Amino acid sequence: MPLTKILIYLLFFILPFGQLERLPNLPVYLHDLVILLLIILNLKFIKLPRSIWLFVSACLLSLIVNIFRFGFPQILFSSLYLVRWLAYACLLPIYQHEKIDLKPLLKYLCLALAVLGLLQYLLIPDTRFLAVLNWDDHYYRLISTVFDPNYLGLIFVLGLVLFNLKILPSLILLIALLFTYSRSSYLALIVVGFYLALIKKKFKIFIFAFFALIFALYLLPRPGGEGVKLERWFSVESRLGNYREGFGLWQKSPVSGLGFNTLRYFRNDPISHAAAGLDNSFLFVLATTGIIGLLTYLNLLKSLWQTSLLLKLSLVAILVHSLFQNSLFYPLIMIWLWCVVYL
């Protein structure tokens, strides 16, 4: 077996470990090192679409014009996430060259996260101790190895799209999704279902599935804590405040932005895992790369939309979710997206 294929299998073996594969005291994961090796081995085969380079150029421009605002060390550090984003995009031509079947690997990834998550929910339901490591303190929510029920929930939604209603794996993913108590993920699933019903003209099935989901949500246990209250309002108020902050940051530099991934230097809590982003991917792009960056990113998304139904359904889920989380720039979601683009 060629070394490239071995590394791809290794990549998907590592991914379910989530935050456990993060290197100590570094914003780098083991899977990042595997991807770096893949790029080095396949450099001559890597040719990226123009839409990707346009967005990268807009990000670089945003960093260059803000170099005197932050200084070179801060700009260099901020640019590392752009390097990661570009590295993940480089997986696409590597997959295309190897002609590898990624569906079984993606199915393994989401099911592994679901099984690990269900075990975590049963054995370690109280994960508030993770707050000392600057993670959110969750109580009786399924977080698996990702430590974030919202991004994890989106992975389960994408897995449901991929499995296309195969009963056993879909049931496992749906149960895991329910126990994340992630409203943004529930909404993503509902919108995907509605979009599919619109295409297939099967509205009766959608209506039945919709009310079945509502009934299942009603039956969910409420063991205590705000996180499991689906009617919780504090997170809505927090998100609205986050949106206002994002628009305020954008107004500081509306054309070219404040610099890609520089928001940590404007936040009150720069060590938090959420300090570098906003609760909306489009607002994140707008604030950091300005109108120029947002237009190039929308152009990239438009180019991706003109492909398979699987990709369209996956994009619908991610785009809906990204209105409430910075989903489009979450590592695991980015890797998943480029895999589906290849499929």
Where are these regions (language model features)?
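Alpha-helical transmembrane segments of multi-pass inner-membrane proteins
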Residues: 94, 103-138, 144-200, 310, ...
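Aromatic-anchored transmembrane helix interface
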Residues: 54, 63, 72-97, 110
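Transmembrane alpha-helices of multi-pass inner-membrane enzymes
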Residues: 36-41, 161, 311-323, 327-343
